[in-house]
Regions:
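Conserved amphipathic alpha-helical segments that form helical-bundle/coiled-coil interaction surfaces
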Residues: 1-77, 95, 110-121
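Short amphipathic alpha-helical segments at helix-loop
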Residues: 31, 80-84, 103
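Extended hydrophobic/aromatic segments used for targeting, binding, or gating
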Residues: 74-82, 86-89
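C-terminal-biased regions
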Residues: 85-104, 108-129
């Protein structure tokens, strides 16, 4: 998975500005969620900030090229499950915080692991329930 590799590389390659961008992207996402927004753009921007911090243009390009598909999937999942959206968003935000924590701690193995888990959980939320 591209994003797992990007998270691992971000934990190693990110400079201070990248770290701030990732944290700010998470804050914007949390603000969107707190205001009852679906936060689709903010969610994508968080993942893009991680990819950019990897300093690997391949990861950034792949993520940018699949943006419409990711946004469609996020919108579909969140709109079809509005009754569960609150609890799901709390869980998703926890997963995002775990990703940020691993990157800030410069732990590539943990960053890769928590990103992979987040993507697996997302797939399960989308198709498994």
């Amino acid at each position: 998975m591209v994003e797992s590799g990007a998270a691992a590389l971000a934990a190693v390659m990110a400079d201070d500005e990248d770290m701030v961008r990732i944290e700010q992207a998470l804050i914007r996402l949390e603000q969107a969620v707190a205001s009852n927004s679906l936060g689709v753009d903010e969610d994508f921007d968080f993942h893009l900030a991680v990819a950019q911090a990897s300093k690997n243009q391949f990861f950034v390009s792949v993520l940018a090229s699949i943006r419409p598909h990711m946004e469609f999937g996020m919108n579909l999942m969140r709109n079809l499950s509005l009754s569960k959206t609150g609890e799901r968003l709390v869980r998703v935000q926890s997963e995002h915080r775990d990703i940020v924590k691993a990157i800030l701690q410069r732990d590539p193995l943990e960053a890769e692991t928590v990103m992979r888990r987040h993507l697996q959980e997302t797939r399960q939320r989308m198709f498994g329930s």
